[in-house]
């Protein structure tokens, strides 16, 4: 079916943030926390225009009187009723559109279950009455955003990290690796480091947001972890100050690079996983040997937890040590990679060649939810 590109809605549902906007734009219009909050005690907020539920930033700001739910856990939608609320909020409050008037492109994690894949078109067509929809894998969209059809994507967000080899637009499920280590774990680790090393105690949800901000503003990846530890021990040159909301200043030293080091050494979090350099290498090694050269030459970083300064140089160093000496390693770290899955969706939905790939309402009514397996791959 033919769809007006400029009115197509693109929604990237992450564990931490929901990114939403219109195809053809180079950035999402709305980015808000993937949170649904409900009053702990009905009646507490009567007279304050109490609502049954609060979404995103509003839920975050009222967190002291709400029970917060996170419908996307480790990248996977686990609570469909709450997810429906987030989508409703996205359409009517954030984008201010009627979903029955716009095609919708949704993102999904690699290796998404059959049942989860079918639930998305079911809700879009039966609840929101959209005229057309499509489901695309986040990592593949990130690759499209970089103008490539071949590469291995290291996608690390708030809840989960994946390494996904793609060749000429095709994924290889057996070579995809999934790592239950991402931004949320790093924020928790930074909390622990600040407490054990510096005596700063951040316990409430509001204080967790402060730790997240410290991580995002001050953390970086060391090229050589042991050497950086020695530098930090012998001089204050790596220390940075951070101003807390109450005006107090705190000083942060080696925690700045010890926190994201866990991506390369999950054992720091007592996790028995390979680091992101090893999962990337392992994913490539599981692919046909003829693809290796193109994959090593196109290692793409995507997602908010790849935004640490120094991560690309460190990945290059670690992969060079693992790969055959004849292989040329190239790490691609686009500046807008925090939103690259959304940007890829925006590009894909705008292509005239993509238009026949939409699942139309008529096709859904005829075939049911299983049509998603036939049309979205």
Swiss-Prot record:
GO MF annotation list: ATP binding; hydrolase activity; myosin binding; structural constituent of cytoskeleton
Family: Belongs to the actin family.
Lineage: Eukaryota, Amoebozoa, Evosea, Eumycetozoa, Dictyostelia
Origin superkingdom: Eukaryota
Protein's recorded name: Putative actin-24
Locations listed in the record: Cytoplasm, Cytoskeleton
Protein role: Actins are highly conserved proteins that are involved in various types of cell motility and are ubiquitously expressed in all eukaryotic cells. Multiple isoforms are involved in various cellular functions such as cytoskeleton structure, cell mobility, chromosome movement and muscle contraction.
Primary location: cytoplasm
Catalytic activity: ATP + H2O = ADP + phosphate + H(+)
Cellular component GO terms held in the UniProt record: actin cytoskeleton; cytoplasm
Coiled coil: none
Enzyme Commission numbers on file: 3.6.4.-
GO biological process per UniProt: phagocytosis
Keywords for the protein's UniProt record, in alphabetical order: ATP-binding, Cytoplasm, Cytoskeleton, Hydrolase, Nucleotide-binding
SMART domains: ACTIN
């Amino acid at each position: 079916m033919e769809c007006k590109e400029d009115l197509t809605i693109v929604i990237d549902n992450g564990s931490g943030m929901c990114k939403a906007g219109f195809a053809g734009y180079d950035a999402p219009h709305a980015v808000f926390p993937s949170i649904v909050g409900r009053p702990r005690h009905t009646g507490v907020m009567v007279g304050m225009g109490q609502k049954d539920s609060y979404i995103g930033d509003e839920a975050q700001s009222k967190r002291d009187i709400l029970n917060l739910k996170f419908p996307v856990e480790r990248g996977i939608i686990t609570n469909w009723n709450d997810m429906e609320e987030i989508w409703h909020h996205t359409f009517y409050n954030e984008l201010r559109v009627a979903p029955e008037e716009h095609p919708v492109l949704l993102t999904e994690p690699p290796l998404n279950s059959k049942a989860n894949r079918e639930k998305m078109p079911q809700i879009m067509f039966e609840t929101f009455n959209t005229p057309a929809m499509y489901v695309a894998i986040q990592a593949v969209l990130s690759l499209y955003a970089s103008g490539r059809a071949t590469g291995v994507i290291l996608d690390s967000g708030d809840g989960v990290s994946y390494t996904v080899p793609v060749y000429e637009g095709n994924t290889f499920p057996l070579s995809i690796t999934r790592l239950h280590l991402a931004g949320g774990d790093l924020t928790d680790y930074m909390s622990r480091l600040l407490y054990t090393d510096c005596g700063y105690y951040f316990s409430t949800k509001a204080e967790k947001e402060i730790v997240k901000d410290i991580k995002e503003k001050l953390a970086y990846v060391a090229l050589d972890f042991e050497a950086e530890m020695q530098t930090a021990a012998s001089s204050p040159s790596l220390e940075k100050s951070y101003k807390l909301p109450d005006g107090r200043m705190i000083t942060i030293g080696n925690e700045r690079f010890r926190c994201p080091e866990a991506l390369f050494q999950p054992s720091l979090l007592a996790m028995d996983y390979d680091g992101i350099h090893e999962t990337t290498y392992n994913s490539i090694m599981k692919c046909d040997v003829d693809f290796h050269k193109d994959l090593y030459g196109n290692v793409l970083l995507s997602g908010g937890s790849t935004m640490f300064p120094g991560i690309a140089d460190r990945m290059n160093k670690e992969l060079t040590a693992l790969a055959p000496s004849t292989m040329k390693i190239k790490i691609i770290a686009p500046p807008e990679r925090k939103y690259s899955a959304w940007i890829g969706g925006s590009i894909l939905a705008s292509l005239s060649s993509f238009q026949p790939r939409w699942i139309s309402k008529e096709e859904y009514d005829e075939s049911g939810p299983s049509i998603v397996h036939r049309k979205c791959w």
